[in-house]
Amino acid sequence: MEQKVSADVLLNKYQTSISITKNLINSWLGNENTSVSSDEKNDDPPLQARPPRLGLGASRKDQSENSWVTSKNEKLKSLPPALKKKIERQLQKKKEAEKIEGGKNHDNLKRKLNKVGDELNEQQSDTDDDDDDSKARITSRSKRANAQSSGFDIYKKLGKKKR
């Protein structure tokens, strides 16, 4: 007994019922509040496909991640042979220089780190001395504060002794 209704028929029924209710409401409100209906405005955003997400089951990228490397290689292949050899030699020299400098840089970094570590140790010892000095000052202040009392305190002490 249940009838199968197609989506188009159902959509048309829905739109007609909405338009009837809007017309009825507009008739109650009068001509002042008439505005362009939402059907004419077409407020609904167009449906777009969702971009693929990362994670389990995600599709791979179409472009390779090293596309800039491949483009450089393609440019290098398209050059004349003499220029190609010259550029390759320059790249090899650059790599060799980086290897040599890499060892030097490593030693330089070790030296710099050792210097920084020594400076930090010196600063730490200086702050420890300052902490000791400040503790000594605080204890001497508290002793002086106890020794110095107002005149009223003296009368309090005398009053306690008389009783």
Swiss-Prot record:
The modification Phosphothreonine is found at T127. This is Uncharacterized protein PB1E7.01c. Keywords: Nucleus, Phosphoprotein. Residues 88-118 have a biased composition (Basic and acidic residues). Pfam families: DUF3245. Residues 119-133 have a biased composition (Acidic residues). Its main location: nucleus. It is found in: Nucleus, Nucleolus. InterPro entries: DUF3245. Residues 30-163 are annotated as: Disordered. GO terms for cellular component: nucleolus; nucleus. The modification Phosphoserine is found at S125. Transmembrane segments: none annotated.
